[in-house]
């Protein structure tokens, strides 16, 4: 099907995918457009939202919240997150999302007292939880899957105006607002650095977050396609 250059347009979301498609069928009717964000949706936070009891108890602890939402599968770096939790016991780590396999159970990540797995939350209310994160993360193992991944959530994090720390995925390296960690210790150090950012003293960083979010709205992606 991909070799049908006359009738098939191919849209790719990562450089690695673009390279693979070029080898198979050249550049004809090939469009690059990474993932994007509904900016307005993430700007409209419900300040009166009623959180569940588990999350309210986390908020009541008044500790920094390091957050992630998304899939939990073999590409999630459980060891990195556990290292952060053990090194920085003064942080709470909140994980929200769907289990794609049994990797979360096998990791025993929930054995750590400052790691909280909340399960799934509906898309329309997820933003209210993420708005309470102090730092947003994408701690993925670097492998063939993540080398070709444009994480949707990085643009949502940008729209929420949250400092972002990820592992060294090629698609994440493109953005000035993202702190890139190459190993467990760097992850800890960059989360700590991100926590210290504030609008009064780091206005340029938060403006970069806003601009990169606006550059990657779904409207802009649609125009490109």
Where are these predicted regions, by residue range?
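A charged, aromatic-enriched C-terminal amphipathic alpha-helix characteristic of glycosyltransferases
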Residues: 199-225
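Nucleotide-activated donor-binding/catalytic signature segment of Leloir-type glycosyltransferases, i.e.
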Residues: 63, 97, 103-130
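Nucleotide-sugar-dependent
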Residues: 124-129, 136-158, 166-177
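Carbohydrate-associated surface elements
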Residues: 16, 33-36, 45, 133
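A short, active-site helix/loop in glycosyltransferases that binds the activated sugar's phosphate group
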Residues: 6-30, 41
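Acidic anion/phosphate-binding donor-loop and adjacent secondary structure
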Residues: 22, 28, 37-57, 62, ...
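Conserved donor-binding/catalytic core segment of Leloir-type glycosyltransferases
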Residues: 9-10, 55-76, 81-85, 93-96, ...
